[in-house]
């Protein structure tokens, strides 16, 4: 029933979305294509395009039962997409090495619809705060937390990753991101964001992530490699993701 309801809600949201939002999504994709084609763009315009694109994309994918908007590594070939997502999230949680999971308060950078935060909080028994640029996804995350009676432990906020994080220093017992940080920052911007994540973490705690990188077999001198890479990035609304493994 949950899957049917999710698909129905996604269809309803798509049908009722204002035409300007749909147009903004298409224009955002075209913008990202031009950017990968070599057009000079600003961080501000890139960020606006990402928000406009994901506002529609998250509802489209929910129709097909994909609410966690990431492709996990294949940790177990016997498991499907969802099963490997759970394994990936379990591995991230283990990497954070929480001292007292039930009393922990974690930060989910780029939380999307809040499904990962929900699963992490279910495993720890503690709290998770989610931060995301798209108000539509944050609204969905808040609704899901309320529906599952997790509102007291799941907290969501709309915010721009490129700005200082709207949290006090030393607040969190751990931080994680799932394909939601590295693809959207230029190399020189990653250091600034890393400093912000470091600022809001308690001393001695960890940041864990699952991010996609270029494999050692990628060849920048191979035109086919480069062409496929640049044509793929706009589909994810990724601005960069050009970092070697």
Q: What kind of feature is each model-predicted range?
A:
Residues 79-102:
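Conserved alpha-helix/loop element of class I SAM-dependent methyltransferases that forms part
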Residues 163-175:
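A short acidic, Gly/Pro-enriched loop at the edge of an enzyme's catalytic core
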Residues 209-237:
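Short, glycine-/aromatic-enriched active-site segment of Class I SAM-dependent methyltransferases
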Residues 105-107, 117-163:
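Class I SAM-dependent methyltransferase SAM/SAH-binding core
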Residues 110-114:
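Class I SAM-dependent methyltransferase "Motif I" SAM/SAH-binding loop
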